[in-house]
């Protein structure tokens, strides 16, 4: 269908099957902030969303990609670090030549092979973060800082490598903040509205970049951040994009009246999916959503983070299973070093998730939510449900110590077959009033989670 530049028209756009099927994306925060690689270890965003302690958050911001804001806040740990490390007169833009030299070592094909190997289906690269530095030599360069962009075309090179591995390539763009156009320091959540550049030259600048990203680089998603200038006719931009990329998507961060709730940004415009950050939803959502988070507490590389700041493989697996059961995707972030090296702790977690998915991915990829997301066993282990074709997948979020357990409140058909993914030994079962009694031939080896395929799908008892 052809889209017109109206809300009624663009709202007819449907989330494409590929995004429902994909489940796992890789987010990449990489830029000038990767050079200082500093942020205090102050916890995760979810804690701030729960408490509302925003002034404390921004003064002690654990997001290393916010370095340009944090080092301008008087008395902040980042300001103290910057002055001690680089001196009070060292300007943020001076990280540019350092970054440009470092990225000469980067191998985009190695990244693409890694992402494919861990079973990711799509990749989202930051093309411009809030600092305004461009990750490609755009036809619309920054008008205030000469050569304020990377010399290599990271956008184009990674796109080619990712598509060469049969994954989708998408691009993040900070339309809501650009400190080269509006240097507003963000000390509180209320400052974000004032930080959005509304000047006409920025409106043209941001719109030109988005058009470049879908005209020349075929972005699979318009992954905007924070907000967008109010003068832009977004329905026109979205219609133009959809007419070029019918299976593309628009996220919910193009809001022109900045609002937030406990799950993040609330949009006042059309969008295809929601984007809770460092949090997720507790129930199946009718609207598609994508939870984004770092492996640690920062998106950009933070050299101050250690093992205690990073999620374990077990937590990543269980969170991912929970998200998928509720109609979500996981956009899991890596924060590379300036030369493209993925820090070892991040790499270990990524590979661990991929290793689990190599055995159990069938339960998640190409699946859809079932009637309910959550279930129980009689051995105290929680269950998450997904469905595909005629099968129900029941994923245990831990390893039972016994070879017999009950999948509560399920009624199996007489011809039901049950198998544990990754095992060839047959599973026997019997029906009881409380549910399906599963009898394993041998105890399961320890793993973050175990997926069972039940065919045909059972009925719910309650």
Which residues make up each language-model segment?
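Mature catalytic domains of secreted/periplasmic carbohydrate-active enzymes
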Residues: 1-462
């Amino acid at each position: 269908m052809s889209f017109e530049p109206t809300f009624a028209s663009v709202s007819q756009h449907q989330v494409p099957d590929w995004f429902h099927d994909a489940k796992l994306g890789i987010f990449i925060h990489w830029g000038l902030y990767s050079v200082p690689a500093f942020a205090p270890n102050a916890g995760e965003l979810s804690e701030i969303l729960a408490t509302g302690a925003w002034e404390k958050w921004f003064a002690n911001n654990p997001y290393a990609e916010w370095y340009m804001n944090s080092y301008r806040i008087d008395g902040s740990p980042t300001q103290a670090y910057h002055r001690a490390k680089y001196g009070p007169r060292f300007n943020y833009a001076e990280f540019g030549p350092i970054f440009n030299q470092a990225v000469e070592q980067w191998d985009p094909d190695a990244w693409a092979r890694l992402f494919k190997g861990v079973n990711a289906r799509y990749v989202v690269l930051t093309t411009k973060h809030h600092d305004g530095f461009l990750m490609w030599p755009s036809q619309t360069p920054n008008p205030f800082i000469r050569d304020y962009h990377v010399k290599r075309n990271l956008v184009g090179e990674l796109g080619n490598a990712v598509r060469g591995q049969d994954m989708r390539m998408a691009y993040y763009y900070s339309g809501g903040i650009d400190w080269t156009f509006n240097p507003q320091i963000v000390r509180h959540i209320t400052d974000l509205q004032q930080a959005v550049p509304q000047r006409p030259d920025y409106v043209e600048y941001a719109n030109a970049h988005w058009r470049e990203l879908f005209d020349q680089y075929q972005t699979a998603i318009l992954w905007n951040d924070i907000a967008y200038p109010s003068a832009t006719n977004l329905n026109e931009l979205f219609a133009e994009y959809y007419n070029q990329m019918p299976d593309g998507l628009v996220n919910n961060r193009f809001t022109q009246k900045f609002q937030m709730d406990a799950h993040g940004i609330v949009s006042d415009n059309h969008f295809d999916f929601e984007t809770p950050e460092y949090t997720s939803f507790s129930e199946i959502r009718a609207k598609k959503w994508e939870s984004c988070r770092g492996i640690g507490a920062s998106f950009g590389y933070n050299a101050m983070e250690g093992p205690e700041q990073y999620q374990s493989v077990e937590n990543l697996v269980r969170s991912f299973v929970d998200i998928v059961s509720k109609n979500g995707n996981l956009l899991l972030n890596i924060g590379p070093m300036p030369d493209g090296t993925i820090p070892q702790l991040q790499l270990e977690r990524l590979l661990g998730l991929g290793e689990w998915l190599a055995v159990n991915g069938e339960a998640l990829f190409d699946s859809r939510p079932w009637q309910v997301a959550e279930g129980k066993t009689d051995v105290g282990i929680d269950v998450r449900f997904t469905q595909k074709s005629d099968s129900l997948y029941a994923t245990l979020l831990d390893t039972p110590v016994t070879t017999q357990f009950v999948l509560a409140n399920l009624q199996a058909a007489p011809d039901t077959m049950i198998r544990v993914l990754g095992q060839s030994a047959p599973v026997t079962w019997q029906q009881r009033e409380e549910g399906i009694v599963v009898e394993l031939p041998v105890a399961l080896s320890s793993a973050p989670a175990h997926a069972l395929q039940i065919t045909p799908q059972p009925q719910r008892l309650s």
